[in-house]
């Protein structure tokens, strides 16, 4: 309650069915252009990274490169950016928070090898990064890694959980 929701998306703003389904602000961006989000990220208290693509069985070099870029490397750049912002503003009353939704593919096999590889990579990078932050840095930024389970979505059309069930658990 009382949150101002900013959506960062590659896609145009969808038509919301109700006001509750809609972000108050919609910012379009593309992988590789993370720096253009600096002014927006400076206003964010809680950043939730949840983007990705699922290439299915396509393992061509081009598809694997795109999957790694979208699912892992773009996340990594945004994590570093948000860390820098938090580190420069350590006097805040409340720490910033960074939530990274990796995937159940981080802990169990996925039908898509490229998806599994990319999600495991970002999961490992998040763990590695968190272990290298000082106590002072950890006080300025809370980092949370989410592994939500196999819920049905555009990325996982055969998921066994509903997104509503998973969201209630968080």
Residue map of PLM features:
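Canonical Rossmann dinucleotide-binding motif of NAD(H)/NADP(H)-dependent dehydrogenases/reductases
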Residues: 1-6
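N-terminal Rossmann-fold cofactor-binding loop
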Residues: 7-16, 31
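Rossmann-fold cofactor-recognition segment
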Residues: 18-35
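Rossmann-fold scaffold of SDR-type NAD(P)-dependent oxidoreductases
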Residues: 44-53, 71, 100
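Short alpha-helix in the Rossmann-fold core of NAD(P)-dependent oxidoreductases
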Residues: 52, 67-82, 118-119
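Catalytic loop of short-chain dehydrogenase/reductase
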Residues: 56-61, 83, 87-140, 147-155
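Short alpha-helical oligomerization interface
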Residues: 57-71
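A conserved structural motif in NAD(P)-dependent oxidoreductases
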Residues: 156-168
